[in-house]
């Protein structure tokens, strides 16, 4: 596909005006490709959806769910880069290529060493506001984990895999962890809320102390406690194996200051449920 021709057709089809510069690919998309396009009407991000993902039978339905929930977030003034609507829909299609169009937002995501208390305070607050939109006293169904580790040990041995010794030596640990996960899932409180489901630091763009959320395609109803615990860990350095407990506590305090959810829950069960 000739990309310049494609973007010219997009601009014409959506009446964005003439393309003034050749669109350039920007970083940030793991599964999809992102391009910045400058037209007579402004600067945009055009997100080209991965063909292989769109072939999945559940893809269109999942995007429809996310698009509908995205509209709810916008109605509740959650700061985010929202997909633009054309022809009464957000997802567009041209010559078999599905895509979204967003207004360009000149912010940047933060790396672990750049995250400060003010960032955790703001993200804890906005997470609470998202969860508060539509809290439901309903159980969130999370699948239990059932993995036959012995089967994989035998496969690794047959293939002379370098991971054979590792998984053989730690099989008891894997099975013990799996048991704890399944026990923890049964202890989850019966509550559901709108969740971003991918709101780690790479999906929040900052300009100074102001921010906007991006990548809203994972929006779903989920257990808010699970998302809270996961994000508090992510924003305090867990993924880099260097937790800053001041950031962790700031995130939690900000969240519970802005919600009526009970903080007195089984946090160990939540930890194992996230594994």
Which residues make up each language-model segment?
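ATP-binding glycine-rich phosphate-binding loop
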Residues: 16-38
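Short secondary-structure junctions
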Residues: 12-19, 74-79, 188, 259-263
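Active-site activation/catalytic loop segments of kinase-like enzymes and analogous catalytic loops
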Residues: 225-260, 274-275
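A cross-family kinase active-site recognition segment
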Residues: 113-168, 192
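All-alpha amphipathic helical-bundle segments outside canonical DNA-binding/catalytic cores
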Residues: 261-273
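Active-site acidic catalytic loop and adjacent metal/ATP-binding pocket
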Residues: 31-39, 45-46, 181-226
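ATP-binding pocket architecture of kinase catalytic cores
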Residues: 39-139
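Juxta-kinase regulatory segment immediately upstream of eukaryotic protein kinase catalytic domains
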Residues: 1-21
């Amino acid at each position: 596909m000739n990309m310049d021709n494609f973007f010219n057709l997009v601009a014409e089809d959506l009446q964005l005006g003439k393309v003034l510069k050749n669109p350039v690919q920007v970083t940030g998309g793991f599964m999809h490709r992102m391009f910045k396009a400058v037209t007579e009407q402004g600067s945009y991000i055009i997100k080209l959806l991965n063909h292989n993902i769109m072939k999945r039978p559940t893809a269109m339905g999942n995007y429809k769910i996310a698009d509908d929930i995205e509209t709810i977030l916008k109605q509740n003034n959650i700061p985010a880069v929202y997909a633009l609507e054309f022809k009464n829909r957000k997802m567009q299609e041209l010559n078999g290529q599905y895509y979204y169009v967003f207004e360009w937002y000149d912010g940047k995501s933060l790396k672990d060493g750049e995250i400060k208390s003010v960032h955790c305070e703001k993200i804890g607050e906005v997470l609470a506001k998202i969860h508060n939109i539509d809290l439901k006293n309903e159980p969130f169904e999370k699948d239990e984990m059932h993995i036959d580790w012995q089967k994989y040990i035998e496969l690794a041995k047959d293939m002379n895999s370098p991971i054979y010794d590792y998984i053989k030596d730690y099989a008891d640990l894997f099975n013990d962890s799996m048991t704890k996960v399944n026990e923890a899932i049964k202890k989850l409180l019966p509550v559901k809320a709108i969740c971003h489901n991918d709101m780690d630091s790479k999906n929040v763009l900052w300009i100074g102390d102001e921010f906007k959320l991006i990548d809203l395609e994972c929006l779903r109803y989920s257990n808010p406690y699970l998302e809270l615990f996961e994000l508090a860990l992510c924003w305090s350095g867990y993924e880099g194996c260097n937790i800053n407990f001041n950031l962790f506590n700031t995130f939690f305090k900000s969240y519970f200051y802005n919600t009526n959810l009970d903080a007195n829950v089984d946090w160990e069960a939540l930890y194992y449920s996230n594994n």
